[in-house]
């Protein structure tokens, strides 16, 4: 059975048109049992590909195309955990060297973008034979980039063959496409040079780990090269391998690939000419079609299936371990955590014995779950970060769902009492979810936050910690501008279109765009406007480049670069993994968010300025009932006041007229998409002013909605509503919260709604009360 072992996705950044999910789904539809994803110089799309392939029932094989300093791109496949680690470390060495020597990452330079290039056979630019180029460093590549000769600067950008040899264990090498090292050597140095390069690869990887790659994509000179490759494979005793090296999931994505090529080379479709691929053959092909194409060489097809079986490694065998916390002698992680939590509980609840007794029970329950899930080390490491901040007099505050944990409160990670506030612990941690908790720490932005980040590097090593990535994608306005330039639309029309489509950010990108473009003064029947709509829709959510998450850090026991490749971050002294926070979370890699807040910097500066004048301020001891402060709030005198400085907040403050601290909690929560979309703001304000009676959809909701006058304003209330009316467990309630997330899934929401209705029906809640509860909950789908 044929298996494609050299696919490229959109995570080759403008060199592929299909998302990893689309490739996996197409391979499954073609009844391929496996698929290998080999993106350029990275494993950026590997986690998404792994999840999608697992979901559709095919085996997700891992690899990458590695740019060589000597020229060409070398496809490498991970056969074992050792091979995967070697691939990650090879890619890391390539990427991080740019930071060490001050070189930028290789990317299309402006000089390379559309001026002085003629067509390569694969559709990428090749330098014209100018006098300045003759014999001075530019060699022709058939497939991809202009291939420079091995100069010092270029040696520092790509991986050398010596470095590849150092990391060859557990890897299988393919000889590559027209941009591979073998084809490049054949074209520039002739058969002798190509034979030398092939022998070098065999010496590096071993005869059983080098496959001579054949492709038939209706391209000039392809068969001549294939004949030479077949003869050399026979001479060397190497197996042949048929691939199509697809950049598309389906042939119909060719217009999108052309647009991406234009974006990459800063040109238009009108002017791109031979920059574009010369046909649409680089798509995932059905096995029978590959068998027909290679009818004269059936072993090349058969070898693909046999090699796919041999490639046993998937991301399931990632081997990530969270760091061990250095414990005092004789202590276990859970024992030391119990000791710290009990000591903190005695301090936190010293003034209220009744609450202290409730807190003891809650902390014991949480610690039991933490022990079962083996998470004690995680809490100790976050506690260690907080303690470092305190030692260094850096303001620090836990935020988010961690505030629902009595253990976090006792450890001093958070400042909200979840026992007194009756917060739902399962919102933070649940045995049913089977994943790591997520604790976010707010820090003063600037140098103080950077000191904490550097402390993490010092504690766990430069190769043991890194920032998480943020994948910047084509969406809305940005996508419109790029597509408009590709189509050579007038600048004023591009600007009009980009403003218009920005209003569609939170809708389905295909939501009758062509019809609605008339609103922007466009003729939807015009060929370029029609093509704009098609390309704008197709490019949505494709990756544009890799950014850095605002504060997420991942840490590892040992070397993180054996788990995921690292790259230099834009800021000196930092590194970033090639995966975003969702990818890391899905693969069990633990993230801690160290988030910088300008307001915390302002507070810290103010505290230090007051201390210099002899006034010591403790934020925890400031009175929460100062009438002067509430008078200012009621008058909307809040310019520059964190959380209540927006126009919407200032417009609402005189109507809500906060009088106590809990009123401020409501004030901040009420100006959010959930309450606004759900039409909850005005009912709450009317009830607060006594102009409307307080009612609840069902008596079981009265204790949950009492403090907010029968109107659900907090996600916490929604989860408790689901538990009270539909019998949801804490874990099921957390699933509901996820379905309500910003990137919500219509399918997931439909499943949750059906489960809510069934649960309420079992408890006798039907008709209008059930509908009112459903409306209240689903209104938070953008919250």
Give short role names for the model-derived ranges.
Residues 104-154:
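Long, intrinsically disordered low-complexity tandem-repeat segments
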Residues 1-103, 107, 149-783:
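Alpha-helical scaffold/interaction cores of sigma-54-like transcription cofactors
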């Amino acid at each position: 059975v044929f298996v494609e072992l050299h696919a490229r996705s959109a995570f080759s950044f403008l060199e592929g048109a299909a998302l990893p999910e689309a490739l996996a789904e197409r391979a499954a539809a073609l009844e391929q049992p496996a698929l290998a994803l080999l993106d350029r110089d990275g494993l950026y799309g590997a986690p998404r590909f792994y999840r999608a392939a697992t979901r559709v029932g095919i085996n997700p094989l891992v690899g990458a195309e590695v740019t060589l300093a000597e020229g060409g791109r070398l496809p490498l496949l991970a056969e074992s955990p050792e091979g995967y680690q070697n691939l990650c470390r090879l890619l890391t060495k390539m990427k991080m060297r740019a930071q060490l020597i001050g070189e930028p990452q290789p990317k299309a330079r402006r000089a390379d973008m559309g001026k002085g290039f003629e067509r390569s056979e694969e559709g990428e630019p090749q330098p014209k034979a100018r006098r300045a180029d003759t014999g001075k460093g530019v060699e022709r590549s058939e497939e991809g980039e202009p291939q420079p000769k091995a100069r010092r600067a270029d040696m520092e950008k790509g991986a050398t063959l010596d470095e590849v040899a150092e990391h060859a264990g557990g890897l299988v090498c393919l000889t590559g496409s027209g941009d591979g090292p073998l084809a490049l050597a054949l074209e520039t140095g002739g058969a002798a040079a190509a034979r030398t390069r092939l022998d070098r690869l065999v010496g590096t990887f071993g005869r059983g780990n080098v496959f001579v790659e054949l492709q038939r994509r209706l391209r000039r000179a392809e068969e001549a090269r294939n004949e030479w490759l077949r003869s050399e494979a026979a001479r060397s005793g190497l197996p042949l391998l048929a691939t199509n090296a697809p950049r598309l999931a389906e042939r119909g994505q060719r217009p999108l690939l052309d647009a991406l090529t234009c974006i990459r080379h800063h040109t238009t479709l009108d002017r791109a000419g031979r920059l574009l691929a010369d046909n649409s053959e680089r798509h995932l092909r059905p096995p029978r079609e590959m068998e027909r194409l290679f009818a004269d060489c059936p072993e090349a097809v058969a070898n693909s299936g046999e090699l796919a079986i041999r490639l046993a490694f998937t991301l399931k065998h990632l081997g990530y371990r969270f760091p061990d916390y250095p414990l005092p002698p004789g202590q276990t992680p859970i024992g030391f955590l119990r000791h710290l939590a009990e000591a903190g509980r005695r301090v936190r609840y010293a003034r209220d014995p009744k609450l202290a007794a409730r807190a003891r029970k809650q902390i014991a329950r949480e610690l039991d779950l933490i022990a079962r899930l083996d998470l004690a080390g995680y809490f100790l490491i976050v506690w260690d970060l907080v303690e470092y901040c305190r030692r260094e007099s850096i303001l620090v505050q836990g935020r988010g769902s961690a505030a629902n944990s009595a253990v976090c409160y006792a450890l001093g990670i958070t400042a909200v009492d979840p026992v007194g506030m009756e917060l739902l612990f399962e919102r933070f941690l649940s045995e049913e979810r089977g994943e790591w908790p997520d604790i976010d720490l707010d820090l003063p932005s600037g140098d103080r936050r950077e000191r904490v980040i550097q402390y993490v590097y010092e504690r766990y090593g430069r190769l043991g910690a890194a920032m998480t990535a943020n994948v910047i994608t084509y969406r809305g306005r940005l996508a419109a501008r790029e597509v408009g330039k590709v189509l050579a639309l007038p600048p004023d029309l591009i600007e009009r279109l980009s403003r218009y489509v920005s209003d569609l950010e939170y809708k389905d990108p295909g939501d009758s765009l062509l019809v609605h473009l008339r609103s922007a003064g466009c003729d939807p029947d015009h060929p370029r406007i029609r093509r704009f709509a098609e390309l704008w829709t197709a490019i949505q959510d494709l990756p544009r480049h890799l950014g850095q998450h605002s504060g997420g850090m991942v840490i590892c026991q040992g070397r993180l670069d054996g788990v995921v490749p690292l790259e230099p971050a834009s800021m000196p002294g930092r590194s970033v993994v090639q995966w975003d926070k969702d990818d890391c979370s899905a693969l069990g890699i633990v993230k801690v968010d160290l988030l910088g807040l300008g307001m915390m910097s302002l507070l810290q500066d103010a505290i230090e300025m007051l201390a210099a004048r002899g006034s010591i301020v403790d934020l925890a001891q400031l009175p929460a009932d100062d009438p002067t402060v509430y008078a200012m709030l009621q008058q909307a005198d809040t310019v520059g006041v964190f959380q209540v400085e927006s126009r919407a907040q200032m417009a609402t403050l005189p109507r809500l007229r906060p009088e106590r601290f809990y009123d401020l909690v409501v004030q901040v929560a009420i100006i959010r998409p959930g309450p606004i979309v759900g039409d909850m703001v005005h009912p709450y304000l009317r009830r607060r002013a006594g102009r409307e009676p307080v009612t609840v959809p069902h008596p079981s909701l009265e204790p949950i909605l009492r403090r907010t006058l029968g109107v659900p304003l907090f996600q916490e209330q929604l989860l408790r509503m689901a538990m009270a009316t539909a019998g949801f467990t804490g874990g099921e309630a957390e699933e509901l919260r996820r379905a309500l997330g910003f990137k919500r899934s219509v399918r997931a929401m439909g499943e949750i709604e059906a489960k809510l209705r069934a649960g309420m029906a079992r408890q006798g809640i039907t008709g209008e009360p059930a509908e009112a509860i459903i409306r209240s909950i689903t209104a938070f789908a953008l919250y």
